[in-house]
C-alpha cells in the first residue's frame, strides 16, 4: 500500500510537470480577442466584470499580475496562472483515474502485484496525458479565462469525494464533505459550472453508504442532487440577498433607521442562528430545538425564498413548515422510533452551507 501511494504520488506530480511545461511553453504572450482581455484587465485593476462576475478569479489574477515587471507583462502572468491551474487539473485527473482503476482491478490491498500496479498507473498516465493534449482543454489552458480555473476546481472536488469514499467508515470522514462544500463555495466565485459536480458527488455518496442500492434509489439520489443544485443556484446565491433586502427595507423604510442597519442586523442574526443550529445538532440533546434551529437557519440563508413580495414570503414559509414536519418524522426500527434525518446529517449540512458561503 505504501509503495503504491509513493508511485502514485510521484507519477501524479510527473504528469503535473509535463502539463505545466507544455502549457507554460505555449501560453498566449498577450490578450486573446474575446473575453480574456476583460478578465485580465478586471483582475489587474480589480474592476467589475460581466455578470454574474468572477471575484475569486479576479483576486488570484491580481496576485499573479504583481509578478509582472511592467504592464505589458500582465496578460502573460495571468495566462501563466491559467496554465498552472490547468496542470493542477491534470494532476487531480490522474489521481482520480488511478483511484477508479484501482477499484476495478483490486478488491483488497493484498491482491496488489507489480502487474496490477503497472496497469493502474498506466491507466492514469494515458488518461491524464490524453486530456493534457486534447484540443479544447489545451486551448483554454493557455489564456486568461475562467474555464481553466473552473476545471481545476472540478477536478479537485471530484478527487475529494473519492478520498471521502476511501475514508467513509472513519469517525471524522465528514470533514471531506465539508471541504468539498468549501471548495464549491470558492468555485462559485470563479464560475457556476462547478455546481455540475454535485450529481456525481451525490451518486458516489449514495453508492458508498448504500452498496445494495437499486435503480429506484439511484434515480431518487439523482433527483435529490438536482434539488441541491437548484437550491444553491436559485436559493442560496440569490436568497441571501433577498432576505437581507427585506431586513434593510424594514429597518430603513419602516423603522427609520440609518442605511445598512437592516443588513447589519441580518448578518448578526444569521451568524447567531447558524451557530445555534450547529451547536444543537452537535450536542443532539433536544430533538425539537434541533429541528427548529435548523429550519430557522435554512430560512435565514434564503433557500426557500424565490422572488420578491408577499407571494415569495408565503411560499417560503410553507416550504419551511414542510421541512420542519419532515425533520420531525420518525420511523420504527427495532421497537424504537428513530429520526429519518440524523443529527449528524444536519450538522454536516449546516457546516457545508456555511463554508459554501
Language model features by range: what are they?
Residues 45, 50-76, 80-84, 91:
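Short hydrophobic/aromatic helix or loop-helix immediately within or flanking a transmembrane segment
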Residues 122-125, 167-185, 214-227, 289-297:
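Short hydrophobic alpha-helices at membrane interfaces in multi-pass membrane enzymes
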Residues 114, 118, 157-176, 203-214, ...:
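Membrane-interface transmembrane helices that cradle and orient dolichyl/undecaprenyl
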Residues 172, 211-223, 255-265, 283-295, ...:
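Membrane-interfacial entry segments at the cytosolic side of transmembrane helices
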Residues 13, 80-112, 156-160:
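Transmembrane-helix motifs of polytopic, lipid-linked glycan transferases
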Residues 24, 71-79, 104-120, 124-151, ...:
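Aromatic- and kink-enriched transmembrane "portal" helix at the membrane-lumen/periplasm boundary
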Residues 1-22, 88, 108-125, 324-357:
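Start-transfer (signal-anchor) and selected internal transmembrane alpha helices
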Residues 153, 193-205, 238-240, 312-319:
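Transmembrane-embedded, aromatic-rich helix segments that form part
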